Protein backbone atom coordinates (compact mmCIF):
# COMPACT_ATOMS: atom_id res chain seq x y z
CA UNK A 1 0.00 0.00 0.00
CA UNK A 2 2.83 2.41 0.89
CA UNK A 3 4.58 1.61 -2.39
CA UNK A 4 1.37 2.29 -4.34
CA UNK A 5 1.00 5.68 -2.65
CA UNK A 6 4.63 6.58 -3.40
CA UNK A 7 4.21 5.62 -7.05
CA UNK A 8 0.95 7.57 -7.27
CA UNK A 9 2.62 10.68 -5.84
CA UNK A 10 5.51 10.34 -8.29
CA UNK A 11 3.03 10.10 -11.16
CA UNK A 12 1.21 13.23 -9.97
CA UNK A 13 4.52 15.11 -9.76
CA UNK A 14 5.48 13.94 -13.26
CA UNK A 15 2.17 15.07 -14.72
CA UNK A 16 2.38 18.39 -12.91
CA UNK A 17 5.89 19.00 -14.27
CA UNK A 18 4.85 18.02 -17.80
CA UNK A 19 1.93 20.44 -17.69
CA UNK A 20 4.13 23.32 -16.53
CA UNK A 21 6.72 22.52 -19.21
CA UNK A 22 4.12 22.52 -21.98
CA UNK A 23 3.00 25.98 -20.87
CA UNK A 24 6.52 27.26 -21.53
CA UNK A 25 6.64 26.07 -25.16
CA UNK A 26 5.45 29.32 -26.73
CA UNK A 27 4.48 32.20 -24.50
CA UNK A 28 6.10 31.47 -21.17
CA UNK A 29 4.41 31.60 -17.79
CA UNK A 30 1.41 33.71 -16.82
CA UNK A 31 2.44 37.37 -16.62
CA UNK A 32 2.33 39.09 -13.27
CA UNK A 33 -0.88 41.12 -13.29
CA UNK A 34 1.09 44.28 -12.45
CA UNK A 35 3.80 44.01 -15.11
CA UNK A 36 1.81 44.79 -18.26
CA UNK A 37 -0.13 47.99 -17.55
CA UNK A 38 0.72 49.22 -21.08
CA UNK A 39 -0.38 46.03 -22.86
CA UNK A 40 -3.63 46.38 -24.80
CA UNK A 41 -5.84 43.83 -26.54
CA UNK A 42 -7.34 44.44 -29.99
CA UNK A 43 -10.72 42.86 -30.67
CA UNK A 44 -12.82 42.46 -33.80
CA UNK A 45 -16.48 41.41 -33.53
CA UNK A 46 -15.92 40.18 -29.98
CA UNK A 47 -12.91 38.06 -30.91
CA UNK A 48 -9.39 38.71 -29.67
CA UNK A 49 -7.06 39.48 -32.59
CA UNK A 50 -3.78 41.11 -31.54
CA UNK A 51 -1.81 42.90 -28.87
CA UNK A 52 -0.56 46.46 -28.81
CA UNK A 53 1.21 48.97 -26.59
CA UNK A 54 -0.18 52.14 -25.01
CA UNK A 55 2.51 54.82 -25.54
CA UNK A 56 0.58 57.74 -24.03
CA UNK A 57 -2.96 58.41 -22.84
CA UNK A 58 -4.30 58.70 -26.38
CA UNK A 59 -2.11 56.54 -28.65
CA UNK A 60 -1.48 52.83 -29.21
CA UNK A 61 1.31 51.30 -31.31
CA UNK A 62 0.84 47.92 -32.98
CA UNK A 63 1.44 46.02 -36.22
CA UNK A 64 -0.16 47.11 -39.49
CA UNK A 65 -1.24 43.55 -40.25
CA UNK A 66 -3.47 43.70 -37.14
CA UNK A 67 -5.71 46.31 -38.75
CA UNK A 68 -9.40 45.43 -38.98
CA UNK A 69 -12.59 47.40 -39.43
CA UNK A 70 -14.71 48.07 -36.34
CA UNK A 71 -11.91 47.32 -33.90
CA UNK A 72 -12.31 47.58 -30.15
CA UNK A 73 -9.35 48.19 -27.84
CA UNK A 74 -9.32 46.87 -24.28
CA UNK A 75 -6.94 48.44 -21.77
CA UNK A 76 -6.12 47.19 -18.28
CA UNK A 77 -7.11 43.65 -19.18
CA UNK A 78 -5.51 40.56 -17.63
CA UNK A 79 -8.09 37.79 -17.79
CA UNK A 80 -10.29 37.72 -20.89
CA UNK A 81 -13.15 36.31 -18.83
CA UNK A 82 -12.82 38.13 -15.50
CA UNK A 83 -12.55 41.92 -16.07
CA UNK A 84 -10.40 44.09 -13.83
CA UNK A 85 -12.36 46.79 -12.02
CA UNK A 86 -10.39 49.52 -13.87
CA UNK A 87 -10.55 47.97 -17.34
CA UNK A 88 -11.34 50.52 -20.05
CA UNK A 89 -12.51 50.20 -23.66
CA UNK A 90 -11.91 52.46 -26.61
CA UNK A 91 -12.28 52.44 -30.39
CA UNK A 92 -9.92 54.01 -32.93
CA UNK A 93 -10.51 57.66 -33.76
CA UNK A 94 -7.78 57.60 -36.41
CA UNK A 95 -5.28 55.08 -37.75
CA UNK A 96 -1.94 55.93 -39.32
CA UNK A 97 0.31 53.79 -41.48
CA UNK A 98 3.72 54.29 -43.08
CA UNK A 99 2.07 54.13 -46.48
CA UNK A 100 -1.32 55.65 -47.26
CA UNK A 101 -2.19 52.46 -49.15
CA UNK A 102 -1.23 50.37 -46.11
CA UNK A 103 1.52 48.64 -48.07
CA UNK A 104 3.84 46.68 -45.84
CA UNK A 105 5.96 43.55 -45.97
CA UNK A 106 7.30 41.01 -43.51
CA UNK A 107 10.42 43.14 -43.15
CA UNK A 108 9.26 46.71 -43.72
CA UNK A 109 6.56 49.13 -42.55
CA UNK A 110 4.49 46.65 -40.51
CA UNK A 111 3.48 49.43 -38.14
CA UNK A 112 0.19 51.10 -37.21
CA UNK A 113 -0.39 54.04 -34.88
CA UNK A 114 -3.90 54.26 -33.42
CA UNK A 115 -5.39 57.41 -31.92
CA UNK A 116 -8.06 56.50 -29.38
CA UNK A 117 -11.50 58.09 -29.49
CA UNK A 118 -10.87 59.49 -26.00
CA UNK A 119 -7.87 59.53 -23.65
CA UNK A 120 -7.50 56.87 -20.97
CA UNK A 121 -6.74 57.52 -17.32
CA UNK A 122 -3.81 55.95 -15.53
CA UNK A 123 -4.95 53.40 -12.96
CA UNK A 124 -3.83 50.30 -11.11
CA UNK A 125 -3.67 48.28 -14.32
CA UNK A 126 -3.26 51.00 -16.97
CA UNK A 127 -0.21 53.16 -17.71
CA UNK A 128 1.69 53.97 -20.92
CA UNK A 129 5.12 52.63 -21.83
CA UNK A 130 7.68 55.23 -22.92
CA UNK A 131 9.27 55.13 -26.35
CA UNK A 132 12.94 54.08 -26.32
CA UNK A 133 15.62 56.69 -25.58
CA UNK A 134 18.46 54.51 -26.90
CA UNK A 135 18.84 52.00 -29.75
CA UNK A 136 18.62 48.29 -28.91
CA UNK A 137 21.78 46.37 -28.02
CA UNK A 138 22.43 42.93 -29.50
CA UNK A 139 22.72 40.41 -26.68
CA UNK A 140 20.05 42.08 -24.54
CA UNK A 141 17.52 40.00 -22.64
CA UNK A 142 14.05 40.98 -23.84
CA UNK A 143 10.58 40.44 -22.40
CA UNK A 144 7.71 39.28 -24.61
CA UNK A 145 4.06 39.08 -23.62
CA UNK A 146 0.63 38.44 -25.04
CA UNK A 147 -2.55 36.38 -25.21
CA UNK A 148 -1.32 34.42 -28.24
CA UNK A 149 -1.39 30.65 -28.54
CA UNK A 150 0.84 28.77 -26.10
CA UNK A 151 1.11 25.69 -28.34
CA UNK A 152 2.04 25.27 -32.01
CA UNK A 153 1.08 24.09 -34.59
CA UNK A 154 -2.10 23.13 -32.71
CA UNK A 155 -3.41 26.32 -31.11
CA UNK A 156 -4.27 26.75 -27.43
CA UNK A 157 -5.26 30.29 -26.43
CA UNK A 158 -4.90 31.21 -22.75
CA UNK A 159 -7.30 33.31 -20.71
CA UNK A 160 -4.43 35.43 -19.36
CA UNK A 161 -1.31 36.87 -21.02
CA UNK A 162 1.87 34.84 -20.92
CA UNK A 163 5.36 36.33 -20.56
CA UNK A 164 8.83 35.01 -21.36
CA UNK A 165 12.41 36.21 -21.67
CA UNK A 166 14.21 35.83 -24.99
CA UNK A 167 17.46 37.17 -26.47
CA UNK A 168 18.13 39.89 -29.02
CA UNK A 169 20.27 38.67 -31.92
CA UNK A 170 22.01 40.29 -34.83
CA UNK A 171 19.62 40.62 -37.77
CA UNK A 172 21.83 38.26 -39.80
CA UNK A 173 20.55 35.37 -37.66
CA UNK A 174 16.99 35.92 -38.91
CA UNK A 175 18.24 36.63 -42.43
CA UNK A 176 19.83 33.19 -42.45
CA UNK A 177 16.86 31.47 -40.83
CA UNK A 178 13.96 32.83 -42.88
CA UNK A 179 13.88 32.64 -46.67
CA UNK A 180 13.05 35.86 -48.50
CA UNK A 181 14.35 38.37 -45.97
CA UNK A 182 16.52 41.14 -47.45
CA UNK A 183 20.11 41.66 -46.31
CA UNK A 184 19.07 44.67 -44.22
CA UNK A 185 15.78 45.58 -42.59
CA UNK A 186 14.21 47.93 -40.05
CA UNK A 187 13.31 44.97 -37.89
CA UNK A 188 14.79 43.17 -34.89
CA UNK A 189 15.60 39.49 -34.53
CA UNK A 190 14.85 37.88 -31.17
CA UNK A 191 14.24 34.45 -29.71
CA UNK A 192 15.97 31.46 -28.17
CA UNK A 193 18.31 29.52 -30.48
CA UNK A 194 17.51 26.17 -28.88
CA UNK A 195 13.80 26.85 -29.44
CA UNK A 196 10.97 26.44 -26.95
CA UNK A 197 10.18 30.12 -26.34
CA UNK A 198 8.65 32.40 -28.92
CA UNK A 199 5.78 34.69 -29.75
CA UNK A 200 3.13 33.09 -31.94
CA UNK A 201 -0.30 33.61 -33.52
CA UNK A 202 -2.27 36.16 -31.51
CA UNK A 203 0.83 37.85 -30.10
CA UNK A 204 1.20 40.16 -33.13
CA UNK A 205 1.60 43.81 -32.23
CA UNK A 206 2.64 43.03 -28.64
CA UNK A 207 5.79 44.61 -27.19
CA UNK A 208 9.41 43.50 -27.14
CA UNK A 209 10.99 45.13 -24.08
CA UNK A 210 14.79 44.96 -23.95
CA UNK A 211 16.72 46.19 -20.91
CA UNK A 212 13.54 47.93 -19.80
CA UNK A 213 13.00 49.81 -23.06
CA UNK A 214 10.23 49.35 -25.64
CA UNK A 215 12.38 48.38 -28.62
CA UNK A 216 10.03 46.43 -30.87
CA UNK A 217 6.71 44.71 -31.38
CA UNK A 218 5.74 41.36 -32.84
CA UNK A 219 5.59 41.25 -36.63
CA UNK A 220 6.01 37.62 -37.72
CA UNK A 221 8.01 34.42 -37.27
CA UNK A 222 8.37 30.77 -38.19
CA UNK A 223 5.52 28.29 -38.52
CA UNK A 224 5.36 26.25 -36.33
CA UNK A 225 6.52 28.71 -33.71
CA UNK A 226 9.39 28.26 -31.25
CA UNK A 227 11.52 26.07 -33.51
CA UNK A 228 15.29 25.86 -32.93
CA UNK A 229 17.35 28.50 -34.78
CA UNK A 230 14.22 30.32 -36.03
CA UNK A 231 13.94 33.55 -34.01
CA UNK A 232 11.01 35.90 -34.49
CA UNK A 233 10.97 39.18 -36.41
CA UNK A 234 9.93 42.39 -34.63
CA UNK A 235 9.31 45.87 -36.03
CA UNK A 236 12.07 48.16 -34.74
CA UNK A 237 10.52 51.05 -32.79
CA UNK A 238 13.71 53.14 -32.55
CA UNK A 239 13.96 53.47 -36.35
CA UNK A 240 10.40 54.84 -36.49
CA UNK A 241 10.64 57.37 -33.64
CA UNK A 242 10.58 60.46 -35.87
CA UNK A 243 7.50 59.23 -37.72
CA UNK A 244 5.68 58.31 -34.50
CA UNK A 245 6.47 61.62 -32.81
CA UNK A 246 5.52 63.63 -35.91
CA UNK A 247 2.15 61.91 -36.25
CA UNK A 248 1.36 62.45 -32.56
CA UNK A 249 2.36 66.11 -32.89
CA UNK A 250 -0.15 66.56 -35.72
CA UNK A 251 2.12 66.27 -38.75
CA UNK A 252 0.02 63.64 -40.45
CA UNK A 253 1.97 63.90 -43.72
CA UNK A 254 5.15 62.59 -42.06
CA UNK A 255 6.79 59.68 -43.83
CA UNK A 256 8.47 56.57 -42.47
CA UNK A 257 12.17 55.88 -43.03
CA UNK A 258 12.95 54.06 -46.27
From Swiss-Prot:
Predominant subcellular localization, coarse grouping: secreted
Record localization: Secreted
UniProt protein name: Snake venom serine protease KN12
SS bonds (residue pairs): 31-163, 50-66, 98-256, 142-210, 174-189, 200-225
Example of a GO biological process term: proteolysis
Source taxon at top rank: Eukaryota
Domain Peptidase S1, first and last residues per copy: 25-249
EC identifiers of the protein: 3.4.21.-
Molecular function terms, GO-annotated: serine-type endopeptidase activity; toxin activity
Family: Belongs to the peptidase S1 family. Snake venom subfamily.
Organism: Trimeresurus stejnegeri
